From Swiss-Prot:
Zn(2+) 2 binds at residues 145, 179, 216, 261. It catalyses: Endonucleolytic cleavage to 5'-phosphooligonucleotide end-products. Its EC number is 3.1.21.2. The gene is nfo. GO terms for biological process: base-excision repair. HAMAP family: Nfo (MF_00152). Binds 3 Zn(2+) ions. This is Probable endonuclease 4. NCBIfam families: nfo, PRK01060.1-4. Pfam families: AP_endonuc_2. Endonuclease IV plays a role in DNA repair. It cleaves phosphodiester bonds at apurinic or apyrimidinic (AP) sites, generating a 3'-hydroxyl group and a 5'-terminal sugar phosphate. It comes from Magnetococcus marinus (strain ATCC BAA-1437 / JCM 17883 / MC-1).
Length: 282
């Protein structure tokens, strides 16, 4: 079964996310558990936690199909030790917030070398940060998102994801989220059945579908290999609708959250319905 949704607002409180997802016909959703552009946030109250969990049950959402995203400020590969520690502490706080809400996944961008160290050194710093974060927390899986390769961001090659996974000591608490726009602008084609099969076979060989815990479904404004991160509405960008039809009929992608981060949220309900309409009868 496919679980399609979108990254919904937590305006007014994290407890509002489930009803915002329900309102667009979602079967999954993503959210921030705090303001994503601030280092610290007030703790989630017991009342908020109770209401969040009650609404999850009421609207039929399952924690495993819910994909929280961490703050954009966090850089677990920051070459500056003090700044890396600040990121680590913030990441641990985000993992603890997920645990409080009963959510077993936390999606994050791997990190950036800021042109101060080489890629392998930065990947090793990310691994070290993750191992420290996992030691300080329990239960929540850290889900690495592949990136567009913009600037000095790592994670744009499947080999980067594999490097991080290889270094993480507790393999049960590491996973991957593939973003279709990021995958495409990083140089992996998805536009035809042949190209899609080749890219997914490469992912299986380098990383493995056993680690895939979610996907972000976004069309792309830039072209293949552009290494620029600009999402577009489904069918309006360079990927086109065929990519998403292939995803909706790929049995390997059953049971994980498939999350829209397309640019016009007024279209999300329509895009979710479109994706489900693409499913072919078995």
């Amino acid at each position: 079964m496919k679980y399609v949704g979108a990254h919904v607002s937590i305006s007014g409180g994290v407890e509002n996310a489930p009803q915002n997802a329900q309102a667009i016909g979602a079967k999954a959703f993503a959210l921030f558990t705090k303001n994503q552009r601030q280092w610290t946030a007030k703790p989630i109250t017991d009342a908020q936690i109770e209401l969040f969990k009650r609404r999850m049950d009421e609207y039929g959402f399952v924690p495993e199909q819910t994909l929280p995203h961490d703050s954009y400020l966090i850089n677990l590969g920051n070459p500056d030790a003090a700044k890396r520690q600040q990121s680590l502490d913030a990441f641990v706080d985000e993992m603890q917030r997920c645990a409080q809400l009963g959510l077993p996944l936390l999606n994050f961008h791997p990190g950036s070398h800021l042109r101060q160290v080489d890629e392998d050194q930065c990947l090793d710093l990310i691994v070290d940060s993750l191992n420290r974060a996992l030691e300080r927390t329990s239960g929540v899986v850290a889900v690495i998102e592949n990136t567009a390769g913009q600037g000095s961001n790592l994670g744009y090659r499947f080999e980067h994801l594999a490097h991080i996974i290889a270094g993480v000591e507790d393999k049960s608490r590491i996973g991957v989220c593939l973003d279709t726009c990021h995958t495409f602008v990083a140089g992996y084609d998805l536009r035809t059945a042949e190209a899609y099969a080749k890219t997914m076979d490469t992912f299986e060989q380098v990383v493995g579908f056993s680690y895939l815990r979610g996907m972000h479904l976004n069309d792309s404004k830039p072209d293949l290999g552009a290494k620029v991160d600009r999402h577009h509405s489904l069918g309006a960008g360079k990927l086109g609708l065929e990519t998403f039809r292939l995803i909706m009929n790929d049995g390997r992608l059953d049971g994980i959250p498939l999350i829209l981060e397309t640019i016009d949220e007024s279209l999300w309900a329509q895009e979710i319905a479109l994706l489900y309409a693409m499913q072919e009868s078995p």
